[in-house]
Amino acid sequence: MEWTDDAIVLSARPHGETAALAVLLTRGHGRHAGLVHGGQSGRMRPVLEPGNRVAARWAARLVEQLGTLALELERATAAGLLEDPLRLAALSSACALVDAALPEREPHPALFDATLALFDALQTEVWAEIYVRWEIGLLEEAGFGLDFGSCAATGITDNDQLAYVSPRTGRAVSLSAGEPYRDRLLALPPFLVGRSAGGAEEVVQGLALTGHFLDRHLFALRHAEVPAARTRFVDRYRKAHTTSGITPAP
């Protein structure tokens, strides 16, 4: 058995004395692991940095075997973010979430393309807003899509009136319908329904929103915790923008 595919490195760890066990997100074969011979060498360690884009060739005698991976670096994504720890933390968070959330060998081509788009966006000024949208897309790919199209209580579709999200169903709730229960609802950042361009306060709201569903509706069902890389990223983002004088909403 053998295939070649475009791929993103999600994680890599030592295996034996010289090899590495790598996990990739591939366009056509989903999340896929394999053994990289010489993966601990000075030549291969930079290739196996999470977030890097690679050309991958996987081979095994039988399809159910772990198999081996031969990788060629196409883009050193992580290296381009070394001077910006916050954006690098976002990259690490995205890789860790995909690695933990997706079943093995189940194709998710739309998520693959969205992840490449996110990594491109990390070079722009709106990267944090796009990151929040990417997490919403990840939830949808995993079967936990959020619905901001109309109010769950009244059916209203006016984006100017949608202000909350039900923590149980993931559906939007209008300002008037949700106001009596606002302490039990999650804030819906205006940028997610086209009412603003975003900003640090709304990004923090968005991360709280997606974090709730990642924790309660995705990882909890698997008796697992949200990856530590995601927690570190959110903590760093909140700290960075609180320190700079922008106090995020609760």
UniProtKB/Swiss-Prot annotation:
A GO cellular component entry from the record: bacterial nucleoid
Example GO BP: DNA recombination
Protein purpose: Involved in DNA repair and RecF pathway recombination.
Coiled coil residues, start to end: none
Name of this protein: DNA repair protein RecO
Keyword Repeat appears in the UniProt entry: no
Keywords: DNA damage, DNA recombination, DNA repair
Assigned protein family: Belongs to the RecO family.
Recorded superkingdom: Bacteria
Xref: NCBIfam families: reco (TIGR00613)
Pfam annotation, one family: RecO_N
Keyword DNA damage on entry: yes
